Amino acid sequence: MCPTPPAAPEGPEFHIDGASKGPPELTEKTVSSPTPHVVETTTRSLLHLSAYVSIFRYVTEGVLYERPVDRLEFRTSAPRTSLFVTQGENDTIIVDLNHQRFHIRPANTRQIIEIHTSQGDDTVYIASAFKNPFHIETGAGNDTVITHAKKTNILTGAGNDMVLTGSGRSYVNTGVGNDIVNVSGSGTTSAYLGSGADFFRGDAGRVFVDGGKGDDLIIGGQGHNILSGNDGDDLITAGPATNVIYTGDGQNIIDNLKASDRIYTGSQITSISEGAYTPDKQIGTVFKVTSQPLSETGLIIEGSDTFTERVQDDLRLLLGSDNGHQLLRALTKSIRDSKKPITIREFKHVRNGLYVPTLNDGTAFAASGKPGTRTYGGTVFYNPTYSESEDVPLAALYHELCHAYNFVTGSVFGGMSPDGHGGTKSAPMVNNLELQVVGLPCNIEPFDFDDDPATPARVTNPTPYTENALLGELGLQLRKTYIYYAND
């Protein structure tokens, strides 16, 4: 389904310079604190205002960002929006929005092009493989979003939505409704389908999909698939390559399983073989995971309704994960022992996660082979759209929860060690507290995490409490370094 972009309108056309700062009377600066004791400044410039359309440029600066975050935001209040984005001359972007045409010259290829529509049945079509990243929010309504951009974040909100992605890298969150997500091409996709009876089909690229609450139909693609049914009676079809499947709660049916596939479940599996349903027939490697309900973890989620539902889906997957349920069990024990909750809070635009302990005075650091003081509670800051390389956003959340584990158990490693870099560059020094949650070795005296002489002391976190433990379980590439090296 590829709509044809409209012909040039007969009316006036608008030219927008994405690098413009706007006149002083249309520019304002705001100062905010996304985390305790951290300040950031956002400059907002109004670049265009016409019938149903406003265009703003936002530039956010602060210590949390390697460089300023530059966003060019299109916002339409039309009751129904048809928006087509095509490639113009000399790296310009042409936006046809209902009966208006905009010629956009982005500030640079890093500038994020944001599109926000109002409530209604909207269509957004990104027709070209743009270098600029796109962020699309369509709001409530039965919306259609098609993208061929190299990187796209899509949030469709409530409604029965349809999303089609191409060969780029896509993050999709369709929210409440009976939604369809279809991947076409080699792009990597992370999709959260939210509540409803949803349909998902993968293609050649790596796929991560979480069906959310509801009875879903999930079909893996030709690449590596991570398929999570979540709550509901789901039908999951494994792809022809490698598959890691989390059934979630419900009466689930799995089709096309192979001996190489891994299935994590707390209930009986029903598979389809030659058209017949076969209860509890084991094909592939099955891991039985029994865990506590989400409501009993003691974790608190703060943010929008969309963020809350999204994090709940992440946590339900982790509760059905071999490594994840062990991490959450340890954190739940700390919450019950101390009566101090761990909070997960929404983090926007930051290409990272963060854990802030309730007390960071160094007393939680292990020393001379002895644990430090247990520092309970704390806050995890989580950007649910952020991931690096071939990773999935869930890995960033897991990384920060592993930091929480070290603080609540008094097992934080002090000092620094060389990053485990295997390329041509010399390894820089990295804080041990980061290396240990990735699962990389630290140059320290081995530490006995469980105070059990029968188990070996370690120079990194035990397996369930590392990001690499989750990546390995998901079938993704392990991190060999803490720092992401772009050209090595």
Name the predicted role of every residue range.
Residues T117, I126, I136-T138, T147, ...:
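Glycine-centered beta-turn/loop sites at beta-strand termini
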Residues E400-M416:
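Catalytic Zn2+-binding segment of zinc metalloproteases
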Residues A8-E13, E66-V95, T188, T265-S291:
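GD-rich hexapeptide-repeat beta-solenoids
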Residues N98-F130:
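LRR N-terminal entry segment and analogous cap-like coil->beta motifs
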Residues V412-D488:
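Active-site or metal-binding loop neighborhoods of secreted/extracellular toxin and effector enzymes
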Residues D255-G353:
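A metal-dependent hydrolase signature that marks the N-terminal structural subdomain at the beginning
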Residues V350-A395, A404-V408:
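Active-site scaffold of zinc-dependent metalloenzymes
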